[in-house]
């Protein structure tokens, strides 16, 4: 595989001194990409038209950063500024953005970092710097439930891509990922700690016989410069491609997170846990990657990519996601503060993944803040600290 640079996109509404900070992971369509800037500009690009960009300014007078955004459908766009999530009507976008506002969702105690809508378009989830996640009922705009469990900023929230499911997962700077059942309870169903998750490589190398020994080994490894960066979780994503016989239902159980220590972890959110974690629901069919791959024996909690900090990211990994048009779901793209975009095959020889090379890479001139995909255009969309949207093809 190779990464090929495509023609970048730039909107006149974005100033030279501005920077892209977030992309909509749930796109308006498979040929579009929506990005947000640090000065409150939201730009929607149709990648089929080289010069076609539609931009509008949100709360332009206050120039507040748009931290996260996602589409509910082709008309409704949610974006987060400060502690408020705003729903916009794309059919009424104006220069100031005010005419497009449908409603506002409040209740967050601090800056909202991530938003997502469930597969049924019935719930909105927003996570914030205070360590909370708020789930809203989109039928009436009311708060459905507040989820508490993290000790640090919650950096990302994502619903499982399964109709009828009320489960979501979150990532945080406390180095933990949590699984929640929004309609059932306000406490997490399952928790993973990136500092002591047992990976496929740990068992393959015979380094670990118990969790206590693993934790001791992690401390001993602190001699490397990379150990000074704890594995804070900066992103979390589920596979968003179409379900097929090649990937269902197992792939719907797998999540990926980018870590502050430069690694990328892939884990099964239905994993029962090595030491007394919540058991997976009885009767769930095990198949495909999640059960037939590295998680099959029930011991391994994750596949850790680029854990040595040399052949992967050499600084914090800031974002990671599954390539949606790859029907087997085994390809992941990650970006980092080291200005590199990496492509991984997490399934191929998963037990050796932490020691293996990325299958493709490209180095940029700026830190990468976020990435998303235009699935129908087969484009990887990258937001860095510039005002220009970078595009790449995976050949």
Enumerate the predicted regions with their spans.
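Blade-level signature of beta-propeller repeat domains, shared across WD40, Kelch, NHL, RCC1
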Residues: 370-395
């Amino acid at each position: 595989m190779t990464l090929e640079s495509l023609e970048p996109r730039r909107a006149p509404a974005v100033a030279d001194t501005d920077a892209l900070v977030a992309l909509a992971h749930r796109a308006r369509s498979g040929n579009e990409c929506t990005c947000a800037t640090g000065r409150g500009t939201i730009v929607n690009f149709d990648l089929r038209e080289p010069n076609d960009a539609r931009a509008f300014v949100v709360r332009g007078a206050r120039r507040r950063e748009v931290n996260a955004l996602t589409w509910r459908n082709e008309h409704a766009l949610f974006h987060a500024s400060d502690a408020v999530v705003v729903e916009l009507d794309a059919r009424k976008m104006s220069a100031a953005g005010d005419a497009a506002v449908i409603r506002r969702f409040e209740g967050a105690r601090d800056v909202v970092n991530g938003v997502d809508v469930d597969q049924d378009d019935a719930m909105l989830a927003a996570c914030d710097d205070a360590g909370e996640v708020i789930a809203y009922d989109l039928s009436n705009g009311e708060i459905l439930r507040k989820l508490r469990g993290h000790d640090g900023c919650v950096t990302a929230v994502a619903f499982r891509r399964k109709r009828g499911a009320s489960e979501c997962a979150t990532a945080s700077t406390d180095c933990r990922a949590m699984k929640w059942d929004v309609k059932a309870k306000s406490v997490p169903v399952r928790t993973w700690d990136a500092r002591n998750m047992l990976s496929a490589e740990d068992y393959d190398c015979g380094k670990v016989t118990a969790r206590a020994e693993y934790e001791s080994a992690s401390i001993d490894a602190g001699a490397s410069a990379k150990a000074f960066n704890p594995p804070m979780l900066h992103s979390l994503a589920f596979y968003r491609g179409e379900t097929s016989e090649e990937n269902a239902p197992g792939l719907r159980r797998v999540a990926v997170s980018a870590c502050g220590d430069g690694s990328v972890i892939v884990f099964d959110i239905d994993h029962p846990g090595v030491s007394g974690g919540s058991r997976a629901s009885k009767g769930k069919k095990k198949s495909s990657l999640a059960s037939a791959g590295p998680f099959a024996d029930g011991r391994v909690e994750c596949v850790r990519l680029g854990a040595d900090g040399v052949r992967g990211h050499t600084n914090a990994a800031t974002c990671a996601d599954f390539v949606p048009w790859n029907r087997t779901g085994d390809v992941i793209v990650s970006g980092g503060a080291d200005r590199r975009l990496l492509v991984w095959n997490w399934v191929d020889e998963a037990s050796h993944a932490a020691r293996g090379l990325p299958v493709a890479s490209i180095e940029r001139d700026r830190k990468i803040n976020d990435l998303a995909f235009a699935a129908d255009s087969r484009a990887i969309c990258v937001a860095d600290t510039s005002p220009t949207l970078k595009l790449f093809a995976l050949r």
